[in-house]
Every structure is written in structure tokens, then in C-alpha cells.
Amino acid sequence: MVEEICHICNDKSTGKHYGAISCDGCKGFFRRSIRKRYHYQCRFEQNCDVTKNKRNACRACRLQKCVKAGMKSNAIQNERDAIGKRKKTTGAEKEDLIDQLVAAETLCQQLRSSVIKNTSSLAPYDCGKVKWNYEDARAATLDDIGKSIHQQLVLFIEWAKSLPQFSFLAQADQAALLKGGAASIIVLGVAYRSICLTVENTICLANDTLLPKEHATQVGDINCVVGRIIDEIVNPMRRLNMDLIEYVALKAILFFNPVVREINDQSPVENARYAFLRSLQRRCTDKALENMEDESMDCRSGKLLLLLPSLQAIAQQLVEDVQLARLFGLVNVDSLMEELILNDMKPSDPQILQTSLASPVNSSVKAEVELEE
């Protein structure tokens, strides 16, 4: 007997729902979209790839595919929610949060690909399938490292601004979170981008230049940072086979840190972190069930959370290296890096962060993120 697949995302189907053969994920997505009367917009040309691993990337194209597959909105207009409110606030809430995070990450990748000329055409969801041409890949220079940090900072701000949990905060608390989490988020992003590499002991920067561990000594005193990123973050991620959903959840948990300096109202930050933590735990449970693994939810999510102390320690070392590089004139430390990485702005200096927070999402990316051809 041939097992049917979901006609929307090609995942394993659980039967016919609202008129189409689909999985529970697409069933729930369609139900929520119709009941809450969501109106989605595609940022591209309404032809995004909707597969099991990418179905959360574009909700407009996913809903469009649900309709094309045969799902009928009138099939749920008068349907009673037999699941009840309690279950709705667990599974449905978890997927809504994950949708937010994946959408925010997708936005960053879209912005990144529009400003970095050497960006691979593959999205982050294909990370495990990336095949690098190492003969053509360029080794990173010290200038690449400085530019990469700047570019990631700009995208980091836009990522944060796209999250509802962040936009509800007072601007002073937004700035405190950005300053407190910038270096850690940079380290996490570099590490996740590097797990797809098939070559050993190498990290991949935001502009797709490669920095092997043995080459790091030639581009300033960052050899230790590169080695620690590989040994303490990249290799454990590979062993755990971390996926995109786990990555975006861990990124949010790392970012919404209620104990960073200068936070005035910790409560909404704590609530956001706890919600994302629940999402990560549920994702780990789902993954264990999908793969029929004996590993418990707590065990897998615990292993992922154990990456956080190393991420923060490496981030602090990165900050110290940037300070030394600036002291010896090895790298151009611009105002954004001074404000977010070094937290070394004078009251009289222009506050780039304040301006960025006051502007709409994506309004300053084209002006801020530049790469010389």
C-alpha cells in the first residue's frame, strides 16, 4: 500500500481535510487562516516553494496552494472546534510562534541576498544540501570580517523589528536587547551557516567568504574565536542535526534575555523567552516522534540550550578581539559596531540605533548594507 503524501507540502498525510489530502500541519494552517481571516502577502512573485521544510517561509503561497489542492473555506465555516481552547493554545500557538520566527529569518535572507552580491541562491532551509565549490570560494580577509559584522548587525536589527514581541517593547528596552545580544547573535548566525560546509575546521561569513581555522591567524588575532565557534558550536550543531526551526527558536531564546543591562521592564521579555522556549521543546518532541527516536524532549532541547553559555562566552571574546583590532587599526570599526558591539558611543555621537528603531522594517537596509564588487 502506497502511503499518501500531503498535496500541499509533500509531508506524510493524515487523510482528507476540508477537501484535500493533507498533513495535520497544513490542515491547521488552513483552518487558522480562514477562521482568523488572515490576509497574507508574498514578497516575491507568488511562486515560492512550499515543501515540508519550507512551508512556513511564505504563508501567502502556502494558503494559495491549499486552495489549489482543493481545500474549501466553507468546509470550516460552521465547524465546531472539537479540540477545545486548551489544545489550541498549545499546538496552534506553537506553530504561530514558529511561523513568526521563520518569517523573520526569511526576511533577513531576502534582504541579505539583495545586498550581498556573492550570496548563494540557496535559502537557509537547504543548508544541509549546499555544495560549495571550494576552488571558486574566496578566503576571508580582515576587511571581510569587519564588513560581515556590520552587515549582520544591520540584518539583526531588521530581524528584531519584524518580531511582534520586540515591537511592543519600549524603545529603550529594544535598544538594550539589541546591545546585549548583538555579538551572541552574530556568533550563532555564523555557526549555523557553517554547519552545511563539508570541509573541516572552517566557518562561513555572511558574504560567503570562508575562514579556515588555520588561516585565521593570518587575519588578526581571531584564531581562538574561530576555533571555539567550530569546536563548541558548529560541531555540536552537526551532531544534533539542528534544523531551521530549532535554530530560529534558539536564536529568539538567546535574544530575549531579561537580564541584559539597562532593561527597565523584564516581564514582557521573560514572557517572550518562555513562549519561545515552549516552542523549542515542542519542536524537539515532534522531531523525536517523526524520527521514532528514543531521545526524550527534555534531553534534546537540553542539549540545544547548553549551547547558550558557550555562545555568550565566545561572543564576549569576539567583543574583546574587535576592541583590540580597533586599537591597533587592523579593522574599520564603524559607528554601528561601536554602538552595538563595543557599546562605546559618546552622548554627542549620532545614535544610529535610535534612528533605525524609529524607522519601518527594511527602510535603512539598502543604505546601510553595502558590498564592494
From Swiss-Prot:
GO biological process terms, semicolon-separated: cell differentiation; negative regulation of transcription by RNA polymerase II; regulation of transcription by RNA polymerase II
Main location (coarse class): nucleus
Disruption phenotype annotation: On a temperature-sensitive daf-7 mutant background, enhances entry of larvae into the developmentally arrested state known as dauer, and also suppresses exit from dauer. Up-regulates expression of the potassium channel exp-2.
Keyword field contains Translocase: no
Keyword terms of this UniProt record: DNA-binding, Metal-binding, Nucleus, Receptor, Transcription, Transcription regulation, Zinc, Zinc-finger
Tissues expressing this chain: Expressed in the ASI neurons, hypodermis, and in tail neurons.
Family the entry assigns: Belongs to the nuclear hormone receptor family.
Assembly notes: Interacts with R-SMAD daf-8.
Protein name as catalogued: Nuclear hormone receptor family member nhr-69
